[in-house]
């Protein structure tokens, strides 16, 4: 299975990955942060076969096996703590927050902003970074800190909520690596970020 991480972006020793579930209309959570719809039952029926390059699309376990750091926002961190199941050990979690202080559950580190998180990643010799949470993903994309996106589309329209993507200063071209159909009709698709190579 070719699920290796892409090469790091310019000036970085680590590759950045977005891995998330999204509704068909582009939301990662309802307005109040609820994500229960991600596991809601869908009508039974024959699913379409996986598309080209299905073997290149990592599942959650494969992703965790090739990252050593996870950066998420405070709201995402607190939502995971509420669930009561911590799936990230032994990955080092960094929480973006200007309000959290003192030791955090599961040894999570706190960075006040994105630039501080990047400095922390560099100082710790990170090799693979997983970006999670809407605002965090959007900030990482704007800062050119994402090299690959693995997006699982859930066959459900929720009509509004927290969007996966936000404003960008310029278009971000992507290269499709593969797609595969999961249980319940979900489709997981992997893209690599394409960076223009300077001719000069």
Task: Enumerate the predicted regions with their spans.
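Enzymes that bind and transform nitrogen-containing heteroaromatic metabolites
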Residues: 1-200
């Amino acid at each position: 299975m070719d699920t290796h991480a892409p090469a790091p972006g310019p000036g970085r020793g680590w590759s950045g990955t977005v891995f998330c579930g999204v509704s068909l209309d582009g939301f990662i959570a309802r307005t109040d942060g609820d994500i229960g719809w991600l596991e809601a039952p869908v009508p039974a029926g024959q699913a379409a076969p996986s598309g080209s390059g299905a073997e290149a699309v990592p599942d959650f376990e494969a992703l965790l096996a090739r990252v050593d750091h996870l950066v998420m926002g405070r709201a995402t961190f607190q939502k995971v703590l509420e669930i009561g199941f911590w799936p990230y050990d032994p990955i080092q979690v960094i929480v973006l927050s200007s309000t959290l202080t003192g030791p955090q559950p599961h040894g999570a580190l706190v960075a006040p902003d994105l630039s501080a998180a990047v400095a922390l990643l560099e100082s710790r010799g990170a090799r693979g970074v997983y970006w999670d949470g809407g605002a965090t993903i959007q900030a990482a994309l704007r800062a050119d800190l994402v090299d690959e996106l693995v997006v699982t589309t859930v066959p459900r329209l929720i009509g509004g909520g927290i969007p996966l993507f936000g404003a960008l200063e310029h278009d971000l071209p992507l290269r499709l690596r593969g797609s595969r159909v999961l249980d319940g009709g979900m489709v997981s698709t992997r893209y690599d970020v394409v960076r223009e190579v300077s001719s000069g």
